[in-house]
Amino acid sequence: MHNYLDFEKPISDLEGKILELKKLASEDESVNTSDEIARLEGRVRDAMVEIYSKLSPWQKTQVARHPSRPHFLDYASRLFTEFTPLAGDRNFANDDAIQAGLARFRGAPVAVIGQEKGNDTKSRIKHNFGSPRPEGYRKATRIMEMADRFGLPLITLVDTAGAYPGVNAEERGQAEAIARSTEMCLNVKVPIVTVVIGEGGSGGAIAIATGNRVYMLEHAIYSVISPEGAASILWRDSTRAKEAASNMKITAEDLKSLGVIDGIIPEPIGGGHRDPDAVISRTEAVIGDALKELSARSGDELRSDRRQKYLNIGRNL
């Protein structure tokens, strides 16, 4: 059963009729509903094309947060072989909001880092809804340093509403951990390819996202603050999130035009949650092409280009 978003009501109604016809046909073999089902399925495709071709920034935010959207572990299981998670920050604890480790991508060894939100109540609590604590960022820093030491390309998959803002996280140095992770991300001499697969929220995202190549899925978002947070600050009214989203330049199209990202990965009609295998396959192709291009550059060139890329963003926006 699909989790329909509020703007998907025409799709929901049509697919509901299809289910009713299929149920009728299963209960009475003398009833032939195949032609009507085919007609309705065509209308569903047309409705999805029409709706998803003109999504507003707030609607894209809803798609980016869709509970059935593939998350880091879904990508890891399909993109990589021999994925070996590494745990702990060697300082305080392990944070399951950040998943990191070593793997093979198309047979070649790589290091992998990403945020995991979870897909049910138990796993969401385990992964803190994808909001990392300081331990997660220190773990990420450790994996980056390991990748640099062994010359492993680094692939990062971003999907977080932001770093965890709890008192305990602040007491353990959340800001410092994010800054150190960002610094390490900028300093390593290996290729870094980043894909924003869902939400890219604030410093919690940028800490693992300062890549040589940064891509976004078509319906992902990337911003310095959530629309709700921006609305609360600007108007002291979080219910104006829709209005905030429209003014924040958070979509892949906006960020590509501003030069913040390098490319957009198209999603299947109806969003990545409709066809996870297709969107992950497209992501694999983009990552593969980027790594092939970057592999020809020296470590010093990779680091210099990466640092200049982000200095230019700061100067020009």
Swiss-Prot record:
All disulfide bonds of the chain are none
> What are the protein's UniProt keywords?
ATP-binding, Cytoplasm, Fatty acid biosynthesis, Fatty acid metabolism, Lipid biosynthesis, Lipid metabolism, Nucleotide-binding, Transferase
Q: Name one GO cellular component term.
A: acetyl-CoA carboxylase complex
Pathway recorded for this protein: Lipid metabolism; malonyl-CoA biosynthesis; malonyl-CoA from acetyl-CoA: step 1/1
| CoA carboxyltransferase C-terminal domain mapped to chain residues | 40-293
- EC? 2.1.3.15
**From the Swiss-Prot or TrEMBL record, what is one GO molecular function term?**
ATP binding
**Where's it found, cell-wise?**
Cytoplasm
Entry annotated with the keyword Cytoplasm: yes
Enumerate the catalysed reactions: N(6)-carboxybiotinyl-L-lysyl-[protein] + acetyl-CoA = N(6)-biotinyl-L-lysyl-[protein] + malonyl-CoA
* Protein's UniProt keywords contain Membrane: no
GO BP annotations, alphabetical order: fatty acid biosynthetic process; malonyl-CoA biosynthetic process
Job description of the protein: Component of the acetyl coenzyme A carboxylase (ACC) complex. First, biotin carboxylase catalyzes the carboxylation of biotin on its carrier protein (BCCP) and then the CO(2) group is transferred by the carboxyltransferase to acetyl-CoA to form malonyl-CoA.
Entry's PANTHER family? ACETYL-COENZYME A CARBOXYLASE CARBOXYL TRANSFERASE SUBUNIT ALPHA, ACETYL-COENZYME A CARBOXYLASE CARBOXYL TRANSFERASE SUBUNIT ALPHA, CHLOROPLASTIC
Q: How does it assemble?
A: Acetyl-CoA carboxylase is a heterohexamer composed of biotin carboxyl carrier protein (AccB), biotin carboxylase (AccC) and two subunits each of ACCase subunit alpha (AccA) and ACCase subunit beta (AccD).
Record HAMAP family: AcetylCoA_CT_alpha
Give the family, as the similarity comment puts it: Belongs to the AccA family.
Name recorded for this polypeptide: Acetyl-coenzyme A carboxylase carboxyl transferase subunit alpha
The upper taxonomy is: Bacteria, Pseudomonadati, Pseudomonadota, Alphaproteobacteria, Hyphomicrobiales
